[in-house]
Amino acid sequence: MKKNEDKLPELKELAESRKELSPMIGNLEIISKEEVRKIIPSFDNNGDVLYASGGGRVEGERFVNTLLTASKVNVVREKVSLKVVGDKYEINGQVFDTVVLATGAWLKDILEPLGFDVDVRPQKGQLRDYKVSDENTGSYPVIMPEGELDIIPFEKGVVSVGATHENDMDFDLTVDKQQLDAFGEEAENFLGELKNAQIINERVGIRAYTSDYSPFFGEVPTLE
């Protein structure tokens, strides 16, 4: 969605250019509010929107738990450090040939003792889960207004609203209801059912960000 509808054709053109690498985007078309309401009855917006038939949504916690169960890995729930021992790596007394550093915002803390200055910082994100009366939300598409707000419908009337992008909060995991209330009020302008919805959960997490917002991946120099 765009505040200025005149920019929708440009957005559609950009999305079309990315379909070759991301065919999951599906078909793209600019549709009216009335057409959206055939898909989402309580949708409320005055202008046209760009609709993508593909894409998907993931409930992060369930996804992570599924991966952990399938991999059968031994999850260590404590702070660890990484040491280089010859051509191998030691973590909490265990030695490995190769280590994948999927540590998110904690990557800087892991590599700093080894002499690396890593351009990764923590960014706080909060979202709130609502329960609406419509039980058919599982077939609704994600609503993405311009800005930080996303409205993500799941099955059986559960709708997630978020997520905040809070800098300079370090690793603070406290819930800020004022921030979530503001997001909820904004979301009501796009999904009317949220006005009478029940709050069922609030979640806080830390995402990793770089100074130029680009993805950060690859082998660590000198540790290949």
What are these regions (language model features)?
Residues 1-39:
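Dinucleotide-binding Rossmann-like beta1-alpha1 core, especially the glycine-rich loop
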Residues 7-8, 58, 82, 106-109, ...:
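Glycine-rich nucleotide phosphate-binding loop and flanking beta-alpha elements
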Residues 8-15, 33, 60-64, 180-184, ...:
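A general structural signal for well-ordered alpha-helical segments in protein cores
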Residues 27-70, 164-169, 224:
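Helix-loop-beta segment of a Rossmann-like dinucleotide-binding subdomain
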Residues 32-33, 75-79, 201-203:
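Short loop/edge segments at beta-strand edges and connector loops
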Residues 56, 75-90:
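A conserved short coil-to-beta-strand element within the FAD-binding core of flavoproteins
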Residues 92-98:
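Core beta-strand elements of the Rossmann-like FAD/NAD(P) dinucleotide-binding domain
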Residues 103-223:
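Active-site substrate-recognition segment that forms the wall
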